Amino acid sequence: RYDFSLVLKENKGTCSSKHAYLKDFADKNDIKNVKFFIGIFKMNEKNTPKIFPILSQNKIEYIPEAHCYLKINGKVVDVTSENSLFEKIENDILEEIEIKPNQVVDFKVEYHQNFLRNWLKNSNQTKSFSEIWNIREECIQKLSE
């Protein structure tokens, strides 16, 4: 995650590394209308159908998930993959903040984990943070298959 140029060298990357690379490129070229965001959205069976069995098995309606994207002239641009459709999650965004490219390394994880801890405190969820984080990891693994 530290070397954003790996996106080009390896021809792959995450939502974090791809958008951080593009924002960094924009900054270095004095392109001011590009903003970089982390959005926390309700990852659920509707917007992420592949994880339904995991959510169902654990009796969870959704898990707050972090996703990175750009806004260019205020319009969301998501280049995570050719199938990325921000429209799938835009109505499920719980919170978003603008960040700098170097914040995707440590800050993104801390921000996401803090959000989850607060969500657990303020929801009827009976699972622990560790349980939720592990279920989330299982969902992410399922999505990479």
Predicted segments, located by residue:
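Secondary-structure boundary elements
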Residues: 1-14
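His-Asp-centered catalytic microenvironments across diverse enzyme cores
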Residues: 39-145
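Cysteine-centered nucleophilic/redox motifs
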Residues: 11-38, 70
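Acidic-enriched, low-complexity/disordered segments with a strong bias for Aspartate over Glutamate
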Residues: 3, 24-30, 78, 92, ...
